[in-house]
């Protein structure tokens, strides 16, 4: 959200923070009629992502659903096949700038091959085939904006359940690295 133009009206739904079940999420998605729904996940999340994205698409068929994260980056073509028909597009690699370019270039919902071909790291379907654009690495990771605290205020998160000192402060997990932080060996 931080990389998107400020003119974009962005909502962040954190199901854990808001103690939201799937039924509440689907109702909110249907009621708010989002233009774009962004999901992210690891390889372990791919089955729940497929199931959720299919339900999201049924509740909000006009919404464009995109998927990023480690799973989409490791196996983009297989991921696109697996999450069909719920997910419309995937992003591989560093998605911040690519997502911003996607939003800017498709505001008028022009998803022509020529428009999509110019978006780095985008994976999409064209004429029955899956197309993967080359990724564009972010040369300076310090250029990535900090999170949009206005749409995810730290005080809105529950207090940490861990540690004697930290129990009095709100807690939300945030990754400060690229890629997967876990030491598994089955993905890569």
Residue spans for each PLM region:
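Glycine-rich beta-alpha loop elements in corrinoid/cobalamin-binding modules
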Residues: 3-140
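Radical SAM [4Fe-4S] cluster-binding motif and immediate context
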Residues: 142, 147-188
């Amino acid at each position: 959200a931080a990389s998107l133009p400020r003119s974009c009206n962005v909502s962040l739904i954190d199901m854990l923070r808001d103690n939201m079940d799937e039924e509440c999420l689907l109702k909110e998605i249907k009621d708010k009629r989002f233009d774009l729904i962004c999901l992210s996940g690891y390889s372990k999340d791919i089955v729940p992502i497929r199931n959720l994205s299919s339900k999201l698409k049924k509740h909000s068929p006009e919404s464009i659903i995109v998927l990023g994260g480690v799973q989409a980056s490791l196996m983009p073509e297989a991921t696109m096949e697996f999450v069909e028909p719920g997910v419309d597009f995937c992003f591989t690699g560093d998605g911040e700038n690519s997502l911003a370019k996607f939003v800017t270039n498709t505001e008028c919902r022009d998803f022509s091959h020529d428009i999509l071909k110019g978006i780095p790291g985008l994976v999409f379907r064209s004429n029955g085939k899956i197309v993967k654009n080359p990724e564009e690495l972010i040369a300076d990771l310090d250029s990535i904006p900090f999170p949009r605290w206005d749409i995810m205020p730290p005080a809105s998160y529950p207090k940490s359940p861990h540690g004697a000192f930290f129990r009095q402060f709100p807690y939300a997990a945030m990754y400060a690295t690229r890629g997967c932080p876990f030491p598994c060996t089955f993905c890569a």
